A protein has these predicted regions:
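Glycine-rich, small/hydroxylated-residue low-complexity segments
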Residues: 1-171
Length: 171
């Protein structure tokens, strides 16, 4: 019989005094791939969390969560992917990796047109991943907590990188 091992671990750091929340989730399928997600948030209204958890009506709880998200801020987001053989299997039938790289580069240029440095770094990371198929990392670290409701306007205005530093790595 074939043995298939899946692992999942998570850690949560919830500081009610500071109103901060952090979580790290690790997921892996032995012999295929592993992924890690790290998320750090600030300006969490603990009273709203309690209010939402005590709500007896789902609509009331959703409204409280919506109010809470108006003030929630991002401090960090990191994603790491380590490949064993999953990418090899998924990409085995791709007729031309160079064409896939070109298509991804076009999408990146459209999405990150205002951010040429980050676009170049992301294209290099994706190219490195597609050529070596071993790992990929992305991180976004706020210089100071950035409101989740501010992200869209910062992105559109071209000011996102004034508030958040981005790093991309592929190998």
């Amino acid at each position: 019989t074939d043995v298939f091992v899946v692992s999942l671990s998570s850690a949560i750091d919830f500081d009610t005094a500071k109103g901060s929340f952090g979580t790290e989730i690790d997921f892996g399928a032995e012999g295929f791939a592993k992924a890690k997600l790290l998320l750090e948030l600030a300006d969490l209204d603990v009273a709203k969390v309690k209010q939402a958890n005590q709500a007896t009506d789902i609509l009331e709880a959703m409204q409280v969560w919506e109010e809470m998200f108006e003030y929630l801020s991002l401090t960090a987001l990191k994603i790491e992917y380590a490949d064993d053989q999953l990418a090899d299997k998924v990409l085995a039938d791709v007729p031309d990796i160079n064409q896939l790289k070109m298509m991804s580069e076009m999408q990146i240029d459209m999405f990150l047109g205002q951010y040429p440095e980050q676009a170049k770094q992301l294209k290099t990371a994706i190219s490195g991943f597609l050529e070596d198929k071993n790992g990929f990392k992305v991180s976004a670290t706020a210089k100071n907590p950035v409101g989740l409701n501010e992200l869209e306007s910062l992105y559109i205005s071209g000011g996102l990188t004034d508030s958040i530093s981005f790093e991309f790595e592929g190998n």
